[in-house]
Amino acid sequence: MFFRGRPKEGKEPGHETRDSPETVLLDEATGLCKTWYFEHRVHEEVQRCARYGRAFAVIFWEPRLLPGEALTDEAIARIGVVINEGLRQTDLAAQLERTRFAALLVESEHNTARTVAYRMKGSLASRVRGGPGTWRTGLALFPDDGVDVPTLFQVATRKLSEDVGIAV
């Protein structure tokens, strides 16, 4: 039997960092959930809502960028703040790609999800300085638009590409 005693001040080989739940689940740059956790929670929500006959929504937001234009790290951090402030504590958000952001709205019907999607679109357009002025939005509802994660993401992506970027 080995006695470990107090942890060493230095780092042990193979244990360079001890990950807290926040660093494992949240992206440092945005403060939003990491993509793997977001997708995991959407899968769980599909199972839960199928079992209990509930609805939820997945929303994608994406800035309209000119060719060669990119979001700065500062703009991405501000986007994370704006999205976190605009969601309920029960909802989750993530940065899926460099320019694509998503939210999982738990227990949300169509009208609620649509209101959140467009309110957030307006907040992003007005509060992310240095970023693009218009944002595209894609909304998919469970079970109306699909009953599995790939289908819901495809529907949200399709609606995102159909959004003509009309100002909010």
Language-model features: where?
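Signal-transducing coiled-coil linker helices
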Residues: 1-46
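Conserved long alpha-helical elements within nucleotide-processing catalytic cores of c-di-GMP signaling
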Residues: 27-46, 50-58, 64-84, 94-98, ...
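Short catalytic/binding micro-motifs of nucleotide second-messenger systems
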Residues: 48, 85-92, 121-131
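A structure-centric signal for secondary-structure junctions around beta-strands
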Residues: 53-55, 90, 134
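Hydrophobic, well-ordered secondary-structure segments
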Residues: 62, 105-110, 124, 128
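Short, internal active-site loops enriched in acidic
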Residues: 62-67, 142-146
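A short glycine-enriched loop-to-beta-strand structural element that forms part of the catalytic core
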Residues: 95-106, 130-159
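The C-terminal output helix
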Residues: 162-167
